């Protein structure tokens, strides 16, 4: 079994020029990434880092049914685990439930596997995809039709083929479906470029568009980075307000290399200043407090403000 990474998306708003020609929009799920490798009828599950994970007994049983229905033996699926009740709970609650179950030792029940990409087994083993997304989507649709064709006889409640929201060339549909995701309290959408191949790394062939909010927060501290950012700014500590109480959290994404050097050597340029931070949502943390999910530095220091504003 090769050591591998799954395909990871770059951010659409940083690479909007990459969307040319036909593309497919699907929902961005907020769960636990899971890759499935099927060879000679044997089913194995792997994390996004390519590590073997076990215990998904319900999904494995449904996958065995799918193998018989679709006459499969050698295939690679990529997808996301969500809670079985995900349609009736918030994205944040779904994420909490899924990660808790996925990290449980032994059997892991109560999850649904949403499959959003597929490769032939030899493509996976050689780590080289030969099929454009438009063809891979056709394969997924075939599996979806196979599942639906026997739905009255054989139930597969723990497997779902992620549906297409839009396919075409109209880029205005990106904001349309992003706004719908926001209104439905979803995390965002994914843009699959129809003429691109699956890559086992972060790539512009797949782009994510998240629903984000803005807040003007106070910078109260800085911290050093790790790895390539040793001796540079790793991020900032910001204060925000929730339910009339003040909380703190780290923000390490969005800084340019120049900013990381400058702000680490000259922290007073940003300390005690108000800056605009983007984030997905406010969520509870393990310390019974609150934090910001996916906070991102926007390069905007608000010299016209001195107070925190969550609006």
How should these model regions be labeled?
Residues 308-311:
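Extended, charge-rich, solvent-exposed interface segments
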Residues 16-150:
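Covalent nucleotidyltransferase
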Residues 2-51, 103, 107, 120-121, ...:
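Nucleic-acid 5′ end/cap handling module spanning
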């Amino acid at each position: 079994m090769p050591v591998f990474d799954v395909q990871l998306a770059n951010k659409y708003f940083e690479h909007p020029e990459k969307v040319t020609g036909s593309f497919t929009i699907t929902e961005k799920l907020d769960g636990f990434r899971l890759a499935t490798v099927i060879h000679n009828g044997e089913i194995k599950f792997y994390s996004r880092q390519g590590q073997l994970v076990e215990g998904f007994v319900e999904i494995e049983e449904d996958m065995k049914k799918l193998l018989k229905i679709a006459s499969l033996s050698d295939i690679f699926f990529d997808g996301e685990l969500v809670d079985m009740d995900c349609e009736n709970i918030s994205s944040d609650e779904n994420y909490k439930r899924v990660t808790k179950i996925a990290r449980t030792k032994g059997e892991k029940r109560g999850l649904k596997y949403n499959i959003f990409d597929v490769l032939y087994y030899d493509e996976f083993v050689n780590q080289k995809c030969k099929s454009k997304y438009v063809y891979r989507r056709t394969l997924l649709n075939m599996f979806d039709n196979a599942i639906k064709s026997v739905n009255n006889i054989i139930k597969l409640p723990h497997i779902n083929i992620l549906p297409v929201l839009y396919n075409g060339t109209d880029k205005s549909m990106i904001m349309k479906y992003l706004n719908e995701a926001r209104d439905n309290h979803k995390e965002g959408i994914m843009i699959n470029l129809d003429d691109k191949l699956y890559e086992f790394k972060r790539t512009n062939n797949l782009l994510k568009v998240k629903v984000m909010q803005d807040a003007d927060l106070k910078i109260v501290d800085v911290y050093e980075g790790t790895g390539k950012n040793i001796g540079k700014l790793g991020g900032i500590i910001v204060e925000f307000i929730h339910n009339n109480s003040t909380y703190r959290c780290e923000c390490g994404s969005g800084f340019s290399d120049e900013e990381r050097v400058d702000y680490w050597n000259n922290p007073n340029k940003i300390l005690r200043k108000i800056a605009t931070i983007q984030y997905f949502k406010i969520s509870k943390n393990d310390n019974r407090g609150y934090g910001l999910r996916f906070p991102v530095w926007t390069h905007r220091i608000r010299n016209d403000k001195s107070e925190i504003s969550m609006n």
